[in-house]
Every structure is written in structure tokens, then in C-alpha cells.
Curated annotation (Swiss-Prot):
MF GO annotations: aspartate kinase activity; ATP binding; homoserine dehydrogenase activity; metal ion binding; NAD+ binding; NADP binding
Protein's name in the database: Bifunctional aspartokinase/homoserine dehydrogenase
Ligand binding (L-homoserine): 668, 679
Catalytic center residues: 683 (proton donor)
Record: residues binding NAD(+): 476-477, 505, 556, 799
Gene name of the encoded protein: thrA
Cofactor dependency: a metal cation
Chain residue ranges for the region called Interface: 251-471
Binding site for NADPH: 477, 556-557, 578, 580, 799
Cofactor remark: A sodium ion is seen in the structure; a metal ion may subtly affect the relative position of the nucleotide-binding region to influence enzyme activity, and could increase the stability of the enzyme.
Assigned EC number: 2.7.2.4, 1.1.1.3
Pathway given in the UniProt record: Amino-acid biosynthesis; L-lysine biosynthesis via DAP pathway; (S)-tetrahydrodipicolinate from L-aspartate: step 1/4; Amino-acid biosynthesis; L-methionine biosynthesis via de novo pathway; L-homoserine from L-aspartate: step 1/3; Amino-acid biosynthesis; L-methionine biosynthesis via de novo pathway; L-homoserine from L-aspartate: step 3/3; Amino-acid biosynthesis; L-threonine biosynthesis; L-threonine from L-aspartate: step 1/5
Protein source organism: Buchnera aphidicola subsp. Acyrthosiphon pisum (strain APS)
Amino acid sequence: MKLLKFGGTSLANAEKFLSVSSIIEENTQTDQIAVVLSAPAKITNYLVKIIENTIKNNQILETVHLAENIFMQLINNFLNIQSNFPHKEIEKIIKKEFNELKNIIQGILLLKQCPDNIRAIIISRGEILSVFIMKSILQSKNYNVTIINPVKNLVAIGDNYLDSTVDISESKKNIQNMNINQSNIILMAGFIAGNKDKKLVVLGRNGSDYSAAVLAACLDANCCEIWTDVDGVFTSDPRKVPNARLLKSISYQEAMELSYFGAKVLHPRTIEPIAQFKIPCLIKNTNNVKSIGTLICEQNCSEKDFLKGVTHLDEIAMFNISGPHIKDVGSVISRIFTMMSRGNIKILLITQSSSENKINFCVYEHDIYKILYLFNKEFQLELKDGLLNPFKIKKNLSILSIVGSNIYKKHNIASKIFSVLGALKINVIAISQGSSKHSISLVIKKENILKAVQHVHNTLFFNKKTIHMFLIGIGGIGSTLLNQILKQKQFLDKKNIEIKICAIANSKKILLLDNTNDLSNWKNDFKKSTQKFNLELLNNLIKNNHFSNSVIVDCTSSQLLSEQYVNFIDNNFHVVTSNKKANTSEWNYYKKIRKSVAQTGKKFLYETNVGAGLPVIETLQNLFKSGDNLICFKGILSGSLSFIFGRLEEGILLSQATREAKELGFTEPNPCDDLSGIDVARKLLILARESGYNIELKDIKIEPLLPNNFKIYEDTDKFLLKLKELDVYFSNKIKQALNVGNVLRFVATIEQKRQFFIKLEEVNINNPLYKVKNGENALAFYTNYYQPIPLVLRGYGAGNNVTASGVFSDLLRTLS
């Protein structure tokens, strides 16, 4: 025996009714089939609306006609699809049902209310008509059909007309006494049962699924299939978490936990009978019959797939009960549970403080006023005598739950969850582990639940580490960085690293990207973008940031942008920058950035500020962490000047060498910054501050390469033209040095007596800076550990490729 249950969306029209009949036919080849049917989609909602409109005496007949027309249109469509369908017979049944409904409505109009027993009769009409229609379809295909009347055979416990529970033992006896022919297809309306007086009652929310589970138990079915409009149970709601995965199988206990904490596929009551009688339950999709679905069974899940889902409940309120004189907290909890049970109120989660004088529990917000009334009545004396404090209520909360087999045995699950929430700046208000040890639940603000679910899910179910990158500046460095990221995609995929480019901007406009954008075509997409860029837009993007690992990448030389770094960091962004302006601003701002980093746990990475792709900053920081101290520093910190002076040695004129350096991407946007020495001074300032010196840019003495009276042009072409006036002067200086076996180098120096200066020096062949040219940088650190031979870092210190690679490296360091 196999039981099949079909939901309302599977019966929404004539075509879907026939699809369901085909599924039933196919299954009859191997098993006897019992079928439980819901009302067609929308019908139950219309029937509820009929009751509401009747009580208000508003648009009654219009709503009745809407519901009736769904059925009439449905059976009319059968005429075009299946010629032998008994259209007239079913039409009579439908009209009879709706005529009876209209008579019932007259009684409601007189009473101006709808008793529960009448409400149950009205809202269950859809299921009954579904059975009549399916019976006619199957009989027209020459199948023998037996209809089980749930009012006569499913025995409801108690007198609740709208949310009954079935006595499976008694119901089983009734159904066995029917002696149903084994060759017949069994049909039964879902959602319905009968009380001890054989009066119709309904089974509450998701009652048709519950009916199916009950009937499966009564028939000793070897399988229960729930056919719906989704492929099965997912690791999270696919509408909210697009990369949620279909679960092939889950245990009864896991299914119970998932449904209890918000998963929509099955109601906990549905799982109870199939778990009790160990009936495997398969969730299938009528719109995708080839999908394997999800099997719910007794077998424990494999160790590999111990995590099963991330789900949530919304519209939650948390009550806080406390008092300085609670002597017996167990008694208080007992009274709370008794009181809530009497009021038919569900406690979703409960926690108790270690001091045993405070209890928190969560309920649905719609129960708040009912609870307050019951509490004030139950604890009237304790409140009056000050033994209990006035109750505190927190609203607008959600419960985030993580479900899996023996989740408590996995020591790193909680740490991963808290790490994600911490990165998102989401505070956990309460935490609880289910008594079944199959779930962990956390209470957070409702406004944070969507991003919490998405990021916790992605962290737990995917090993992939994600960076959400906002790139500002797409000149030489920025565009090269994008090309490097594209080139390294396969390598990053192997390392389970994903870099998502969320925005690309320059000083004029911004391109916002999503997962559908093809990054290989970013230049054309950027040209087409019409959205103007400004700091206000950027700040709005930042405030609405829902990502756990977001990075602002600054590849500009903008002072204004650098002044926003504290704001970026405080709003949950890492900052990676090739822009030296922030680190060379006033000391107070320099410290303010680092204070924000310390407070937020975000990263501020600027390796390229001094040596482009050379590991200068990290090396220096690691030296100091290990207890070393700087004694003296000598370095060539300008790749552009390294290139220029190398070319001068080869007989190239200054103006020509400078133009070549700019064309190769070695210089700043205006080469004047390089030749003035100010760019080197900024780098030396950064090194000095990293070494513990509290200094400003003005404390660095610069002996400029350019004469004091040399006119500076902001226009690059004019500046390079003007530079020709110095060609002969520098050619002569180079020759003088070479004549005595020396070379000219523009050297930055830190000496122990707080001496910081930059000047053009002659260096001999024994100096570590002697052979440095062609765009190389060289940094010689004399420290307690490295003397008399210094620690020397040497390599290309300018150029788009090496600088972009340094930024790329910093970007990846945000994951550590």
C-alpha cells in the first residue's frame, strides 16, 4: 500500500487534475494506491472570505460566485481535454454544494456570527469536491474507486471543531472494517475528520498533510508521498537563499525540528504519525516529477551531511520574568507552562539565567495581550508584593535555527555561527539548544534575519569563502586588478574563494553589479552606466550593506575618499587601499583609523602604500611583533625615480626618461609628485609611523630634485615640456658621479635621533642601493636583529601589475 497526497497547487486547474490522475495511474502498476486530496488552490481562502464577508454583510454573493466559478471553469475545461468526463453529473454536485452554502450563509447573516461547527463545514467544501472530481476522472479511465468518508471513519479527539487531532487506533479499526477491495484506488478528502457524534471537524493548519499521515498509518502503508509544488525539503527557503540545496533525505527528528522552526514543507503534526509508525515519507513535486524529492525516514543521516538546514520564525516577542526573591524557579516555570497550556499558547523557546532569578521565553507576537492578561492574573500576588518585577517584552524579533543530527557533537558549529553574526554586527539576544540535541536556536532582531539566514547558511553549507568587493578607481591599478581577478578565477575556485564585484566606480560614475553581470565585459558595462558617483551614494550603499565580508578597495589618490575610511570601517567594511593619503594625513586621523579597526575587528590593509607589491609593511610589522627595533633605514622608495635615474645613467635625458616612466605606469598621475619628492616623503612617513614615530609630513626634510624657482604645471604635457630645461643639468651630475665610480640615488633615510630626510646621494658599489634601477625599490632595515648587514627588500616598486598584485594580496588577506 502506498499513500499519495496532493496539495492545492497540484490541483489548481483541469490540466493539473489530469497530471495528478496520471501519477496515480502510474503508481497503481506496483502498489495499491490511497489518495488524499486538498482543495484546489485559492478555494479555501475564498471560503474563509465568504464567512468574513457574510458576518460583515459585505460582497457576499460576489465571493461565493468567485469560488463557484473556479470549479465550473475547471470542469468545463475537462470537456476539451477528456471527452468522456461526466461533466453534467459533477456540475450538479457543485451546484448542490454551493446552494447548500448559500442556505448556510443566510443563517450566518441572521446570527451575525459563524459558530465553529458551521465554519468547519464551509471551509472543508473544497476538499470534498476535489474527491468527487478525481473519482470521476479515474472512473472514466475504468478504475474502480472507493471513497473513505473521513467524517465517519477518522475519529477526532475532543470537541475542537477547527483544530482537531485524530485517534489513529480507533480510526484504524473503522477503516479496516470497510474491507476495501485490494484492486480499488482509495480516495479521501483531506483536512476533515468526525467527532464522537459523527459531526464534521477540521484538522487545522496543514490539515490535509496530517490527514495523509493518519491514513497512511491506518492503512499500514509502506510509503507516504506528499506531492506539492516544490522539489522537496531544502537547506533553507530557496526564495530567500537562492543557493539552498535540495536534501535527499532527513530523519523524522530533523524534519520535526525544521518544520517546528519555520520550514514550510511539512507541519510538525504531519511528521508525528509517520515517525510513530515508521512510515517513510517522500516529498515530491507535481511540476517536476523527475526530481528525486526528499525522503523522510528513521535512518540517521550520514556523518558527512549532519547539517540539514537553516530556518527561521518571524513576528516573535520575548517575555522577561525576573524578581529578586524568586525562591523556586522550577515552580514559576511549571506555573508558566500550565498557564500557557490552558490558554492554548505555544512557547517557542525558553532560557533561564545562571543566577536562577530570570526567565526568558519566546512566543508569537499575536499572543502578547492574551499572555499579559493570563500572567497578571496568575502572578497577581507576586507582582503586588514585589516578588516579581513587572514583565518586560521585546518585540520585532526572529528566531534563527540551525538543524542537524547530533549538532552538539560538532564543536565548531557555534563558533562559525557567532563569527558570521559578529561580522554582520548582529547581536544575539538569546540562545538555546533543543532538548533533542538536533538544533541550535538564536534570537535576533527581525530586521537582521534575512542577511543572518543567508550568511549563516552559506558559511555552514559551503566551504567557499566570499569577498564582496566595492572598487573605487579604475585607472591603471584598478583596471589591472580587475583583469588579475578574472585571470585567477579558476585558481580561486580551486581554493574555494569567490570574489564578488558589487560595484565599480571612478570619480564620475558608478556601475552596480550583481551575480548576473559578466565581469569580462566590465569596461563596456561601465561605459553604459548612467549612475553618477558621489560620496552620499557610496555611504548609502555602505549603510545598506548586508554582506559579512565586504571590502572597499581604493585605487584612487583622492583625499576626500581617504577621509571616509573610518566611516567605512565603522559600517562593517574592510578597507584595502593603494592610496597613501589616509596614512599620511594628520596623526589624529591616522590613530582614529586604527582605533576603529581595533573596535570593529575589521582590517585596514595598505601594503602597496610603500613598496607596491613588495611585502614591506607586513615584514616590518612582524619584526616589531617579535621584539625587534629599528636602528636605521635607508631606501629607494620611488620606482619611478629608480627607473628615471637608471635611464639617466644610460645617457637618456631627464625629460625623456620621465615621459617613459609615465607611459610605463611608474609615476603618479602627475609626474611632478614623483620629482618633487613628496611621494617619497609620504612613503617615508608611513614607514616612520609603522616604526613607532609620532611625526607629521612636515617633519621630513626634503632636498628637492627640482630647483625652488622651477615652475610647476598641473598639466602633465606642459610639465614634461618645461622639464627639458633641466636635461643638461642632470646629465652633468650623472657624469660627475660616474667619473668617481658612484651613482646617483634619491635616498630616504630614518636615523635613530629622529632624523627623517630625503635627498639625492652618491652611493658607491658597496652600498645595497648601488644596483637599484629600472623601476626597482630597495629598502635596507638596520635593526637589533639585522646588523651590521641589513635586511634588504628589493624588487619592482612601481607599475600597475605589481601594485595591483599587492592590492590583490591584501584583498585575499581579508579572509584570514
